[in-house]
């Protein structure tokens, strides 16, 4: 393209410091180096993880930074040695890459590729430098993506090619929240038909976990949230029962135990609250219940329960990105969406122009949105 090998000047939302609104700026995006791809971002969504880092409690948070990791767009140019992508390809950036050769990628039990983990955690490209600058200052990258910008540079292992007819303002959600929730029952818990399941927290991840339980054939899916306004949506995704946790004096584990003859086969924590993680484990059935942690708790927080809970046959697990090996799985999830097998549109509660990005954060903090998609 005419921009090939050139610095691109474009609009981005910059987080100059923690706890402050994002600032719309013109930034410079350098061309991709070896094994990097520069993409034009067409749509991006706002996730709680972006807010978590902006809030200042993320131990890996660095500023100034371009946040955003749920995005979709097209390849603008590729660096040297890139063979799997060409300009014009429809792509989704992946915050968990899949290099295909590290010991994690070679192990079928995990999706946690470690090839670029260290530099990604420091907000850098794999060579330890940044491609983003603003007003003479270098900006950090975020989660290997930085989609709150008209252009982004990502490692070629942190990207997948998807069907060109897939709408970017929908499939961007498969880059994080929807895939995270949907995969946990299928890949991590391996929910069997007829199982009973409970989902704690009815944000995008919780709703997607409900959908995963339904697809797995669960007979009962109990949705739990303090905000009963979330229940209507939960039923659309497949919840059979909805419970407000503090509606009774009894602990929620007792309420659920009475509803299910002793507890759930599977529970999913989609909040990121260590107290709820404990309740989710203790709501599992003795002898075989499994609880999966999906929520991200604040840095330094610890989970606790009595060892007897595990000695008597409960299992505590966790998952990142729903256990999906990213490069091979996300294109299939996009195909499933295009074929009507999984719901994605129903997660989009708001669509806003990119300039209204701070409003998207406000909607999320107020509990008024599931996902707000920003059109670039």
Swiss-Prot record:
One of its GO terms (molecular function) is S-nitrosoglutathione reductase (NADH) activity. The modification N-acetylserine is found at residue 1. GO terms for cellular component: cytosol. SUPFAM superfamilies: GroES-like (SSF50129), NAD(P)-binding Rossmann-fold domains (SSF51735). InterPro entries: ADH-like_C (IPR013149), ADH-like_N (IPR013154), ADH_3 (IPR014183), ADH_Zn_CS (IPR002328), GroES-like_sf (IPR011032), NAD(P)-bd_dom_sf (IPR036291), PKS_ER (IPR020843). Its cofactor is Zn(2+). NCBIfam families: adh_III_F_hyde (TIGR02818). This is Alcohol dehydrogenase class-3. It comes from Myxine glutinosa (Atlantic hagfish).
């Amino acid at each position: 393209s005419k921009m090939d090998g050139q610095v691109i000047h474009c609009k981005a939302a910059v987080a100059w410091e923690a706890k402050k609104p994002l600032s719309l700026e013109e930034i410079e995006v350098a061309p991709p180096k070896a094994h990097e791809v520069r993409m034009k971002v067409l749509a991006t969504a706002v996730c709680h993880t972006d807010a978590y880092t902006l809030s200042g409690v993320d131990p890996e948070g660095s500023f100034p930074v371009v946040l955003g990791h749920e995005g979709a767009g097209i390849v603008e140019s590729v660096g040297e040695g890139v063979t799997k992508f060409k300009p014009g390809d429809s792509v989704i950036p992946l915050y968990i890459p899949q290099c295909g050769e590290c010991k994690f990628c070679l192990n079928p039990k995990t999706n946690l590729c470690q090839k670029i983990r260290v530099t990604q955690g420091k907000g850098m490209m794999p060579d330890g430098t940044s491609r983003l600058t603003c007003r003479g200052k270098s900006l950090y990258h975020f989660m290997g993506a930085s989609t709150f910008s008209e252009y982004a540079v990502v490692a070629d292992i942190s990207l997948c090619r998807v069907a060109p007819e897939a709408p970017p303002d929908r499939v961007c959600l498969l880059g994080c929240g929807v895939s995270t929730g949907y995969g946990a029952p299928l890949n991590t818990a391996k929910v069997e038909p007829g199982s009973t399941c409970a989902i704690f927290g009815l944000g995008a991840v919780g709703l997607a976990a409900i959908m995963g339980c339904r697809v797995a054939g669960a007979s009962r899916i109990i949705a739990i949230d303090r905000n009963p306004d979330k229940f209507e949506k939960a039923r659309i995704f497949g919840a059979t029962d909805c419970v407000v946790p503090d509606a009774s004096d009894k602990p929620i584990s007792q309420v659920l135990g009475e509803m299910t003859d002793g507890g759930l086969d599977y529970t999913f924590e989609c909040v990121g609250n260590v107290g709820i993680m404990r309740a989710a484990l203790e709501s599992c059935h003795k002898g075989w219940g499994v609880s999966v942690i999906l929520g991200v708790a604040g840095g330094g927080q610890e989970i606790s329960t009595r060892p007897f809970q595990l000695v008597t046959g409960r299992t505590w697990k966790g998952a990142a990105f729903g256990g999906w090996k990213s490069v091979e799985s996300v294109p299939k999830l996009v195909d499933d969406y295009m074929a009507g097998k999984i719901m994605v549109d129903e997660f989009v509660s708001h669509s806003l122009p990119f300039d209204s990005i701070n409003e998207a954060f406000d909607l999320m903090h107020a509990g008024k949105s599931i996902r707000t998609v920003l059109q670039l």
